[in-house]
C-alpha cells in the first residue's frame, strides 16, 4: 500500500509480504493509520478528519494479488476493472471536505463495490470486533458461519417462510386496525350508490334533456320560424299571389326542359335544378311536420327541468357529467365488494397465518437441531485452539435456548419467540480452568482471555472459510508473557496458509513475524510526520528491545530480543 496525507502519515509505502507481517511503533506514531488505510481500500467509511492538516486530500493505493479465476476477479471484471499482471489495483481518495472517490482496476466505481469485494479479500479484526463478539447476535452469526451449509440451507428455508408470515401478519394487522375506517368508507359508498340508484340515470341522458329543455323553452319562436321558412319554400295558402321557392325552381326547371335537348351541358344543369326542387319539397315537408309536432307543453318543460335538477344533484357529488357519475358508481361498487369482503379476508389471512406459524415452527426446530450439532464441533475446535494459546484447561461451549412467548411458534410442545434468524438465542460460554463454571464470555472473560478466544475463533474460521489475508489490530491486548508467545506462534502457523498482518505492541508476537514494519514519528521542529520502514537485522533487535524495556540499548533487553527472535526462528 501507499499512503499519502492520511492522519500523521505524510507519504509512506507499506510493503506487506507473504506470510506474517508485524506492524509496530510507539503509541501515537500512526500504527492505526495502517489499519485505517486498508479499511478505506476495502470500502470503509471515509471521514474528512482523516485528511492530514494542510492537505487537500488523502490518498491510499493498494495492489492486491488475485488469481484470474477467483470470484473476486470475475466480479471486478464485470464492473469494468482490469487486472494488472495478476493484481487488482485499488485506490481511494478522501477530500478535506469529506468527499470520497474510489477506483478499481483503473475504473471509477462506487465505494460500495469495494465493500462488496472486501469479504473475499481480507478479514479485519480489531478490539471493536472483540467487543462485537460479546453480543449474542454476533455469537449466533459466528456459529452459523462455522456450520456452513448445514445451517445455511435450513436458514434460507426458514427466512423465506418468515418473510411470507410477516407479509400475512402485516396485511392482517392493516385490515384489522383500519376496520373502522373501512366501515366508514363502505357506508359512504353505499349511500352514494343508493342515491344514484334512486335516480336511475341513463348514459347521455343529461345531454338529451338539455337539448329538449332548450327546445321546449323556445317552442313558439321555433314554430314561427319553421312556418315562415315553410311558406318561403312551398308558398302560403293565404297569399296566392306570393312567390315561393318551389314555384321559382319549377319555373326554372320548365325553361331548361324546353331546350335541354340542344346542349348536354344545359341538360346537366336542368338535372341539378330538378334535384334542388326535390330537396326543397322534402325540406318543406319536414318543416311542416316539425311545426305541427312542436309541443309548447309547459308541463313537459317542468318535468324535464325537474329531471335535470335530479341529475345535476348527482353530478355535483360524483362527477362532472352523467358518464362520470356512472363510472364512479361502477368503481365504487367494486370497492364496496372489496370492503364488504374484509371479514372473509380476515378469516383467510388468519388461517394462512396459523398455517405459516406451524410451518415456521418445524423449520425453526430443524434450524435448532443443525445449530446444536454444529455448536458441539465448533466448541471443540475453539477449545483445542485455546490449548495452544496458553489456556490448556479452558473449555468453550454454547448455550442454545428459546424464550417462551404466547404469540410465538410451537417447537417441541412449547410456544417460543422467533425472529428473522430462527427461535434460538445462542450464547458462547467459557470455563477458563477446571472447576470454574461455564459463564458467558461477556461476564466471565478477562481482556486477555477474550483476545485469545477471538483469535481462536478466527483461526478455526481460517480452516473452514478462509480468506487470502488476515489483519489483526492489537487483538493481543491484555495478554503478556507465555500467552503472548503462544499467540505469536499461532499467528505464525496461520501465516503458513494465508497472509497475516498484525498491529501489535507485544515483542513476543512481533518476534514471530517474517517481516516487521516500524511506524515512526519524526519532528523537524514545525511539522510532525510519520513514515513506515522495514526493519532488518540490528534495527529489528533495537525495536524489540524498545518494546521489551522501553530502551533500545539495554543489554538485557537486547539479549531478550535476540532470544525471542531465535526462539521464533527455531519454531518455524
Swiss-Prot record:
InterPro entries referenced in this protein's UniProt entry, alphabetically: DNA_recomb/repair_RecN (IPR004604), P-loop_NTPase (IPR027417), RecF/RecN/SMC_N (IPR003395)
Function: May be involved in recombinational repair of damaged DNA.
NCBIfam families from the UniProt entry: recN
Keywords annotated in UniProt: ATP-binding, DNA damage, DNA repair, Nucleotide-binding
Name listed for the protein in its UniProt record: DNA repair protein RecN
Disulfide links within the chain: none
Positions of transmembrane segments: none
Gene Ontology MF terms in the entry: ATP binding
Family membership noted in the UniProt record: Belongs to the RecN family.
Gene Ontology cellular component terms for the protein in this record: bacterial nucleoid
GO biological process: DNA recombination; DNA repair; SOS response
Positions annotated to bind ATP: 25-32
Gene: recN
CDD domains: ABC_RecN
